[in-house]
Amino acid sequence: MTTYETTARAAVPGATASAPAAPLRTRTHTWEPRPASVPGLAEMSGLEILRAALEGTLPAASMTSTLGFRLTEVGEGRAVFEGDPGDHLLNPMGTVHGGFLATLLDSALGSAVMTRLPAGTTYTTVQLGVHMIRPVLADTPALRCEGTALHVGRTTATAEARVIGTHDGKLYAHATTTCAVLRLT
């Protein structure tokens, strides 16, 4: 859960009557921490883990609360996230920072790979290639990011993902990844 609060700003250096300083904003969020050792987690496949997170029986990754996105769909070789841009994600030019899109893409890519991993294995991203197509503004409605696993082998995996505007159907960014597949035991 994320909440926003706007408060009046005291005198700010550089603010003038014709260009007053904007009010300060505060953003807070809460998340359920995932215990370091979840009983039975090592016996679950990647798809089972993601389905449990989607259903709420396992906590979602804390990164999703931090940046304002969520897992919305998961299936064999596929994961979908939706993210909400906002003015808390702006870069110095006033558009949403590319790191938001890169993180959204990396989450969908890795989760798509994870859906194809058996129990006792995990993955880590070793390469991420992101292509930004158009800028995202603070008032851009939700973005949908769908990741698809292309290859999942014993030691490596690859996937691709796209970020599409839910309001306009336009492509905002796309990416590919290579992941290392790791045995936990």
Language model features with spans:
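Terminal targeting signals and extreme-terminal segments of soluble enzymes
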Residues: M1-T185
